[in-house]
Amino acid sequence: MALSHARKYRYIETNAAKDTLTKFGKSDKTPDPYTPEQVKALMQRVEGTVWEMPVILGGLYGMRRSEILGLRWRNVDLENNTFDVSEQLPFKVPPKTKVIEEMAPPKSNGRTLPITELAHPFFLKQFAMQEAQREQAEKDGKPYYDNDLVVAKPDGSPISASWVSSQFGKLLEDLDMPHIRFHDLRHTAATNMHQLTGDFYTVGEVLGHTLAGIGVSLGLSMNFEAVTARYVDVRLERKKEVLDAYHGAVKQADPAKAKEAEPKKAKSAAKKKSSEIEL
């Protein structure tokens, strides 16, 4: 009953107790996560588009879609280079919503994450871009809906989570990148951080994942209760070390070595690219 009420009022996206289908549908197969080379290639190809910040937060930090769309500037500390994941966009916000009155709590406990050397310029760029959009709206006499969102439409209103999911695959197709779902950026971040550091506990803390959950995600099996007892606290600096290892690998990666996408059927030249589709 409690889960049903939480689902009804959009505090959670699904009622896990009622879900009987596998997470990945009929094939029950997760697409291969992107390599650091592919992550860098994707970052370069979405530079300057509405996808830039979602890819940074999803691909480098493994944030959930609703956490990305619900991140607000009040929870970003650019002076101390940290940000708090303490809320998320409510589930199924109507497409034409302009103002978010109240955010939903995150799926897991809130967490503080470091803004790395690689990520910092993207936060600054995003902030400056939104300031310019706000000023332009004032000059044009158009409304600007200041929801304080890090990721938003040009008029400040929230981006629909369903739009992100439905258009991400089309974006990758347009960019000649291997197909993954947007949520697989989270799996990409988890896999790369773990492969580079072996520290699955801290990886779980970065992702806001339960210890058992991150173990399942990475295909690990052990006594998680015993591990939890030994590692009851992960300092921010350790999170930074793990993130720096991954972000450093992405920074040094050669995007030319990224795996080529599979050949695709020819598309109509008149068809709009997903990156050009209006939000």
Task: Describe these PLM feature segments.
Residues 80, 91-110, 117-119, 129-132, ...:
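C-terminal secondary-structure termini that scaffold catalytic or DNA-interacting sites
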Residues 47, 127-131, 169, 173-176, ...:
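Hydrophobic alpha-helix feature that most strongly marks membrane-spanning transmembrane helices
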Residues 8, 12-71, 79, 110, ...:
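Basic, Lys/Arg- and aromatic-enriched nucleic-acid-binding interface segment
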Residues 88-91, 115-177:
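Active-site/catalytic core of tyrosine-dependent DNA strand-transfer enzymes
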Residues 1-13, 28, 157-163, 178-184, ...:
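N-terminal core-binding DNA-recognition domain of tyrosine site-specific recombinases/integrases
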Residues 8, 56, 60, 67, ...:
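C-terminal catalytic core of tyrosine-transesterase DNA break-rejoin enzymes
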Residues 1-5, 20, 115:
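Non-catalytic DNA-binding core/recognition domains of DNA-processing enzymes
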Residues 75-82, 198-229:
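Short, polar N-cap/turn motifs at the start of nucleic acid-interacting alpha helices
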